[in-house]
Amino acid sequence: MFSAFLISNTIAAGSSDSSSSNTETKYDMAVTHIKVAKKFEEKDKVEKAKKRYEKAQKLLLQSNKKYPNKVDTLNYLGFTTRKLGDFEKGEKYYLQGLKIDHKHIGINEYLGELYVATNRHNLAVERLEVLKSCNCKEYDDLKAIIAGKKVSKY
């Protein structure tokens, strides 16, 4: 009886570990590429940043295909897609994420920035309203971007 319990727990642990680490690995690798891309942007190394965003996007697409509708994955898919110049598709990823979690801080900030970049300030203000109660730097950043006091770094 005890050995059957031990075997079933070992099998269960093995199956859950492999599926979750796969998602984390692709997602984590993508996040690393995004962080490096942001550093390249700060140094005006635009082409190097673009290549990193492309790598990140590819990993995020793979992760989203295998494990769809993870809000953080959709947030970064929206971000990388926007950074690669496809605002329309980036917006779709953000909106898909908001259907799952309408108060997601990252999505609301980045989508607000996208709306400012595409001259839809009224929609950016709506994102700001969602962030109003978060007591977070994302609220302050988006507020400053909407007011024209700050330019979006990303």
Predicted regions and their residues:
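Terminal, low-structured helical/coil segments at or just beyond the last alpha-helical repeat
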Residues: 15-24, 125-154
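Structural marker of alpha-solenoid helical repeat scaffolds
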Residues: 66, 100, 131-134
